[in-house]
Amino acid sequence: DTVEGQTAHHVALQALTSGNCKIVLEEIYIPSDRPEKLRTQQVSDSYFVIKGDKLRAYLTREVDGSKLFSGISPLNGGEADLQIGEPEVRHNGDVNISLRVQGSQHYRVFEWVMTLYHDSNQCSVQANKVYMAGNYSFKGRILPLPEK
């Protein structure tokens, strides 16, 4: 446990819960024909921005090319409504937070459970209902947006 790590964790949690952050994607886990064997795709220059109760997707072509987070997904228009649940601190200090991404049609919903690791700004997001339209689990970092 480093002071830098604890600070990064605190800043990330604060930025997320106040609805003012960027989630930089590092790896996306793509379902394959064998459900237990996810394909890992490294990604760069792709991120989500959370502003208040909105989630906006900025995905590079490499990611768009494989239809990540698209199809009949809530992020089709590039932006969706977001509900952030109450943070739950686990015994090891990791924090679990549920995220609900709601598209323009009521059935276009992603349910995500984010784990923010206790001594860093790294998070992993577990997608529920993975079969639905490019709803993938992923790993990344949470960074605060600069105050405007």
Say what each PLM segment does.
Residues 3-7, 38-39, 64-67, 78-82, ...:
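Short amphipathic alpha-helical surface micro-motifs
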Residues 48-94:
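Mature extracytoplasmic domains of secretory-pathway proteins
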Residues 14, 37-39, 66, 71, ...:
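Generic preference for flexible, low-structure residues
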Residues 2-66, 136:
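N-terminal secretory signal peptides
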Residues 40-43, 75-80, 134-140:
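Amphipathic hydrophobic-ligand
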Residues 83-148:
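Helix-rich interaction surfaces within compact, conserved domain-sized segments
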Residues 3, 17, 69, 75-76, ...:
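Intrinsically disordered, low-complexity segments enriched in small/polar residues
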Residues 7-10, 43-46, 76-88, 107-113:
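Short small/polar-residue motifs
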